[in-house]
Amino acid sequence: RKHIIYMKMRKSLLLLTAAFMSFGAQAKVRLHHLVSDNMVLQCSSEARLWGWDTPGKTVRVSTSWSKDIVTARAAKDGSWEVCVRTPKPGFTPLTITFDDGEQTTIKGVLSGEVWVCAGQSNMEMPVHGFDGCPVEGYNDAVIDAANFSGVRYAKIPSRMSMSPEQDADTRW
C-alpha cells in the first residue's frame, strides 16, 4: 500500500515538474543588447534586427513607421534575424514590436546617421577623460549635451574571447 502511494506521489511530482519546465520553454523573445530602447537606425536603408527565441518559434516584427510585418523562424540554436526598411531621418521617437505570442516593444528609436568609431587606446578614453587627466571643456560639453537629444551613444565593452561573442552588454 505504501509503495502504491509512493508511486502515485512520484508520478504527480514528475508531471508537475514537466508542466513547470514547459512554461519555462515558452520564453519571451530576447533581443541583442544593441536592439533596445533609444537605439538609432541608419536612415533610408535596411536595418538588421536580431535576437533569440525558442527554436522553431515564429517572430513577427512590426514598426511604427510602416504597415509591413516581417517574420522569421528561430533556428535550432534559437537565433533569428530580420531586415526592415528604415524611414527618412527625423527626431520623432519610433517603436519596434517583436511578437512571438508575447509582445516586446522597444521605444525611443530614432532614424538618422549611424557612425561607428573603433580604434585602440585613443578610442577608450571616456568623454570626461581619465583619472587625473580631465578633458578640457568637459563640463561645458556635458551641459550643452542637453541641447542634442537626438545624439545617441552606445559603448561596446572590450572583452577578450577565444570565440566570437553573440551579444554585448550595451545600452544606448
Positions of PLM-derived features:
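Short, Lys/Arg-enriched N-terminal segments with co-localized hydrophobic residues
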Residues: 1-8
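Intrinsically disordered, low-complexity sequence elements enriched in Ser/Thr/Gly/Pro
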Residues: 8-9, 26-28
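Sec-dependent signal peptide recognition
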Residues: 10-15
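Hydrophobic h-region of N-terminal signal peptides that target proteins for export
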Residues: 17-25
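Cell-envelope and extracellular/periplasmic
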Residues: 28-172
